[in-house]
């Protein structure tokens, strides 16, 4: 059942469009629950034995699994269908946005003018958008996060609705569930922590910004992103939801905020969409921006080091097939070591993990042999 919150900025599908979106959601749910496990069955029944016959041992890592699994017709069928279903998500949403485009822009302009919640939007037309944002359409989303027209805001509703369909609603009616998982990690790592100034890096449409204001109503909450089109939508969306937050067009690698300006510097699924050069800069900037006693908390994709080789192989599908171009590096990276290389002291950085159930594992390698989100924590 489609339970996404129908706020004023969300594109309204007609019956035909809604039927297509329902079909795509159902297809992906079927693939996740029924077809994807078939890959493991094929591996156990056939593929690992083929590898062992040639090498005298079982595959030791995901790359060795890939060398044989990619030849399996079942995997090829599943992978092709997975790719098509991802494209179908965006196709099913773009029809609605194309039809509703003028009304959405009018609503955004009206809400921004009325500014009922009292939030702010600050854009910088001279800010360069990094190549890692524009080089490929991340997640196959047409136009990527930045889009082709900064004065428009079509990438916002495309992302908002598309993300909900992509996740099958698993992150809640407002696509904000990951923040609540991260809040649980913070409670485990620093009990009683109550930040008064919060920075959400790579906020996109503000679905990871708005919940921080709800969790800490007295805090000043700021979301930054390099995409003007996403931020226009984020501001209108937050105002429509009645949540006063500030949105600023800025690059997380080097912001214009003063040293020690925030008590919490956070992100949700930002790091794996950057680059090898950008990551240490973001981690160093996070440290510079923290006040004494502040916390850095970056929530990101599951690590594969603790997974069995066939699990790690399947968990890595999006790297090659969904334009997640930096994910293959960050999934195997020692993030605390990367933070130390960016200037963080060794004794203040940790890498807990959190499952979708909310279970928190203080050390990433303490997590069970299942896919868990990873979190990089640093305490100033």
Regions found by a protein language model. Give the residues of each.
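N-terminal auxiliary segments of SAM/dcSAM-dependent transferases
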Residues: 5-20, 24-29, 52-151
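Conserved class I S-adenosyl-L-methionine
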Residues: 194-204
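Conserved SAM-binding loop of SAM-dependent methyltransferases across substrates and taxa
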Residues: 205-217
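Conserved SAM/SAH-binding beta-strand->alpha-helix loop
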Residues: 227-229
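Conserved SAM-binding strand-loop segment of SAM-dependent methyltransferases
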Residues: 242-254
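A short acidic, Gly/Pro-enriched loop at the edge of an enzyme's catalytic core
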Residues: 253-265
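A short glycine-rich, Lys/Arg-flanked "PGG" loop and its adjoining helix->strand segment in the class I
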Residues: 280-292
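C-terminal alpha-helical "lid/dimerization" subdomain adjacent to the S-adenosyl-L-methionine
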Residues: 297-359
